[in-house]
From Swiss-Prot:
CDD domains xrefs: RPS2
Protein name, per record: Small ribosomal subunit protein uS2
GO cellular component: cytosolic small ribosomal subunit
GO-annotated biological processes: translation
GO molecular function: structural constituent of ribosome
InterPro entries xref list: Ribosomal_uS2 (IPR001865), Ribosomal_uS2_bac/mit/plastid (IPR005706), Ribosomal_uS2_CS (IPR018130), Ribosomal_uS2_flav_dom_sf (IPR023591)
Species for this entry: Pseudomonas fluorescens (strain ATCC BAA-477 / NRRL B-23932 / Pf-5)
Gene name as annotated: rpsB
Family statement: Belongs to the universal ribosomal protein uS2 family.
Ribonucleoprotein among keywords: yes
Keywords for this protein: Ribonucleoprotein, Ribosomal protein
SUPFAM superfamilies to which the protein is assigned, alphabetical: Ribosomal protein S2
Lineage start: Bacteria, Pseudomonadati, Pseudomonadota, Gammaproteobacteria, Pseudomonadales
Pfam assignment, any one: Ribosomal_S2
């Protein structure tokens, strides 16, 4: 079973929240106190919630379900792409396009366009075009790959979302909520936990913290896939709301 420990979180700075003046009262129960006008997150609360989320992801992966990793801000994008690729999961690391979930039919058409352009780039079609047309298609390919490259192999809607910075990715969370897709999210002291089924109270800006979240989630996916019982066990349990006293 995937587990993270207190030492891992302390080393990564998971406990450092935002400046006290920017706090969201809905996160009050996860705050231990303040130091130099910075809120300190209570890791005694974070630890079981983080591990509960990891267990949920591991069981999803064991049932061959898809977890979509979402982290589009600068500090998260590269780590999200690398860790998602490591565990073979879909991801969005650049910009969330409105309707990525709720208008998936249109997104699927764009993915087909991306695949067609990839084939044309490889089979010599671009070389037969005028210089201007080839340049236009190359730019189109690069733009589509940047936006959709991480989900082109998703093959349908995901079974769960894992989000770094729930405020920054609020559109993604809203779309998932509309479709009943469970959301796992890192929620800092300045953010609202609304719409998040599995809350991980923690720093959502520090590179080391993001590496810990993403690395742990990727490990959970890998472990789950490696533990499929005869390839037939399917996890269909609905997400439980994350209510922590």
């Amino acid at each position: 079973m995937s587990q993270v420990n207190m030492r891992d979180m302390l080393k990564a700075g998971v406990h450092f929240g935002h400046q006290t003046r920017y706090w969201n009262p809905k996160m009050g129960k996860y705050i231990f106190g303040a130091r130099n006008k910075i809120h300190i997150i209570n890791l005694e609360k974070t630890l079981p919630m983080f591990n509960e989320a990891l267990t949920f992801v591991e069981r999803l992966a064991q049932g061959k379900n898809k977890i979509l990793f979402v982290g589009t801000k600068r500090s998260a994008g590269k780590i999200v792409a690398e860790e998602a690729a490591r565990c073979g999961s879909p991801y969005v690391d650049h910009r969330w396009l409105g309707g990525m979930l709720t208008n998936y039919k249109t997104i699927r058409a764009s993915i087909k366009r991306l695949r067609d352009l990839e084939v044309q780039a490889e089979d010599g079609t671009f070389a037969k075009l005028t210089k201007k047309e080839a340049l236009m298609r190359t730019r189109d390919l690069e733009k589509l790959d940047r936006s959709l490259g991480g989900i082109k192999d998703m093959g349908g809607l995901p079974d769960a979302l894992f989000v770094i910075d729930v405020d920054h990715e609020r559109i993604a969370i809203t779309e998932a909520n509309k479709l009943g897709i469970p959301v796992i999210g890192v929620v800092d002291t300045n953010s609202s936990p609304e719409g998040v089924d599995y809350i991980i109270p923690g720093n959502d800006d520090a590179i080391r913290a993001i590496q810990l979240y993403m690395g742990s989630m990727a490990d959970a996916v890998i472990r789950g896939r490696n533990n499929v019982a005869g390839g037939t066990e399917v996890f269909e349990e609905a997400a439980a709301p994350a209510a922590e006293a």
